Structure formats: C-alpha cells, structure tokens
Amino acid sequence: RPNPCPGILGHEIIGKIEQLGDEVRNDLRGNPLSLNDRITWTEYFYSGQSYYRDIHDMPQKSPGVRKYGHDLVEEDPHFLGGFAEYCYILPGTGILKLPDAITDEEATPLNCGVATMISITEASKINMGDTVVVQGLGLLGLYGCAIAKARGARLVIGLDSVKERLSIAERFGAD
C-alpha cells in the first residue's frame, strides 16, 4: 500500500468527539453519539459501491479506498492520521462508541490487530470443542489464542521460539 509523504501516521485511533456533523447521530451499533464521547473508528473510509463491499462485505478492499494514516497531509481534509491532535472523520467511516469499562490501551488495537484475527478465526470456522494451533505468539497470535478460546476451542496450542511468550499466551487462553 502506498504511504505518501508528507503524511500523518496512525490508523489505530481513539478519540473524543469535539464536533458532530449534521447527519451523524449514532455509532455502528445504533448507540447515540454526543460531544465528548470516547470513540474509535474503522481505519478506512469508503462510501461508494463496489464488488468487495456489496458481495463480500469487505469495503476495505474496494478500489479507491482511503485509509487513515496513509494520506497526504497536503490534501483536504488535512487531518487523517492518529498522530494528529485532531482527526477529521470522513463519511463512509464506521464509528464505535467505547464503553467506560474499556481503556484506551485495550481499545486501540480493535480496528486492526483484533479485527484481523477475528476475520481469520471466522474464516477458519472454529467450532465448539475444536483444537486450534497458533504458531507465533506475538500480538496477533495472542489475540488469536483469546478469540479461538472465546469461540469455543477446547484446546488452544500456542507455539513460539521465544519462551517468555508461552507464559503470556496462557493468560490469553493458550493451554
């Protein structure tokens, strides 16, 4: 994916609503949005029709999709990266209001790392009672362990050459 320069990096973003557009009323789940609500949003924005959006429910793969943290700062709107003080959220972006029980640190990876592993575990069709092997227990592997266990895997086997990661993986559901 191109990463034009100069740009404002950052695509796993948490923020507070400073201003709402006239047509923005609710988040992805239908929760009402208000000023100062703590939110996160999809790392991409795409509002047109496309084969990927309409057939596969994957608008992020559509031709012409734009992604936060991957745009020129010189193009309007200028604030499209998470490292900016403010970020302009464009139409076609999914917004999710965060509950107080989830910290910023816990919520930050939801749009990329966790979403990636949810997609992988769904495609793998993990069922209740299955045995799952997760090779590599870095951040994505840890999410994979937790999600596989939450989906009903009876046994989650974590593999990694770094010994310390094995004990960490146990806290994420690896057996």
Short names for language-model regions:
Residues 1-54, 99-101:
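Glycine-rich beta-strand-centered segment in the early N-terminal region that forms part
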Residues 7, 30, 77-78, 147, ...:
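A general structural signal for stabilizing positions within well-ordered secondary structure
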